[in-house]
From Swiss-Prot:
Protein name as annotated: Exocyst complex component EXO70
Organism whose genome encodes this protein: Saccharomyces cerevisiae (strain ATCC 204508 / S288c)
One GO cellular component, as annotated: cellular bud tip
Keywords for the protein's UniProt record, in alphabetical order: Cytoplasmic vesicle, Exocytosis, Protein transport, Transport
GO biological process: one example: protein transport
Amino acid sequence: MPAEIDIDEADVLVLSQELQKTSKLTFEINKSLKKIAATSNQSSQLFTPILARNNVLTTLQRNIESTLNSVASVKDLANEASKYEIILQKGINQVGLKQYTQVVHKLDDMLEDIQSGQANREENSEFHGILTHLEQLIKRSEAQLRVYFISILNSIKPFDPQINITKKMPFPYYEDQQLGALSWILDYFHGNSEGSIIQDILVGERSKLILKCMAFLEPFAKEISTAKNAPYEKGSSGMNSYTEALLGFIANEKSLVDDLYSQYTESKPHVLSQILSPLISAYAKLFGANLKIVRSNLENFGFFSFELVESINDVKKSLRGKELQNYNLLQDCTQEVRQVTQSLFRDAIDRIIKKANSISTIPSNNGVTEATVDTMSRLRKFSEYKNGCLGAMDNITRENWLPSNYKEKEYTLQNEALNWEDHNVLLSCFISDCIDTLAVNLERKAQIALMPNQEPDVANPNSSKNKHKQRIGFFILMNLTLVEQIVEKSELNLMLAGEGHSRLERLKKRYISYMVSDWRDLTANLMDSVFIDSSGKKSKDKEQIKEKFRKFNEGFEDLVSKTKQYKLSDPSLKVTLKSEIISLVMPMYERFYSRYKDSFKNPRKHIKYTPDELTTVLNQLVR
């Protein structure tokens, strides 16, 4: 009997056989996959160069297309630029300024477009040539604009301002068309990098032209007088013409800047300042040179300093409100000339005192002294330079000129409130102080001459020490008569004004009081003494009354005789003197006469004059 087969073993055997088959099949599959992988790798190696070449060809195609487009763009730009260049080559005169600048603007726009597009391009070498050409073309064109600008500025040639001043002709100025062209070019450059250059050209050319013009006048402005020891003649210095020309150019340049910078008002002050600064520097240097000459010879050239005051004040006035870098130079000039003019005021007073002190005796005719003539000649000189004198009154006080031995009681200005800020008031005061100084010092010398053994007591009509009041009063009044005559016939009349004339009247009244002082003493003798007797009734000592009449008669005749010696030439002084004498004598005499005329049995023996007779004598006394 065959052996019995186990079922589980049979299953294992079958499964094992199947697994072997599967393993073999898997091996075969893996083998096939390796072959496929090897084949795929070989294919990939074959296709990679082909794809790379294809990519290169695609890029090359794009580059060729881009290059063709760039070449077309460059060609278009070059053609357009070439057209503009042809126009610009014709020049401004042929093309016209407006069209010329418009073409340059278009080139500038092209350049800006190219430059702004550069950031979006990776390659720009194809535009480099046209870019460089445009930049150079614009620079050449703008250079031509500057040359054209200069040619217009230089259309006005250097000229001698004195000719225009003499003929009262305005200084040369640009035509409206030229002003329009200059403004157009300034406007073109305004706001770009070349703006400051064109402005510098304007400033430089205008300053240079004006300095060349002023050079015609400079040699004459450096001389004050051809004769070193001759007094300066008013208006003869070339500095006056130099100043007038400078003022004309300042006005001209202001108009020019206004015309050219009408749209750019904020630039006007700076541009004008730059143009004028070299002129002001040259003026200040010349001013200083003139002042140095004045200081070296104040006796002859001193009054010229007042013309310099007018000059510097006029220049500063013309520059008022304008910014000037070297305005301090003018301030320095003002300060320096002020020191000179202040010394002239002080020296005038010192000169009067010195001249008066040089008098050794009173003139035999009690007439006008050399000191008076010199003083009035000097004051007339001051009056010829009235405007300069007024200008020199800045920052000056009365103390600047008053003498060191000044005594208020001797002067006719005492404790009066005046507006010292008013230059006219100051100048009037100076003239009056000069006249007062003359009178006071003439009186002092007269007292010393007539009363050498006593200290002078001047400006005092009531002085008991002064025994020669009438003569001294007449002496001073004679000199004041000349003073007043010269005042009335010169600019001094206006310069004195109301206050000055009042002071002169007070001065005359002082010395009229001197002349009537003896008359006052005479009438004082008529003051009667009253006695009371035992009955209580008033009585008079007849002898005393007789003595009073006798003394009056003698004194009256003596004074009449003396007064007749002093013949005044001024009609107003005659009237005043006669009025003063009559007002002093007649009231007292009439009172005394009416009271005591009946005291005597024979009145005519003691009473020589009736009031009417006395009045007649007095009326004939001063004629």
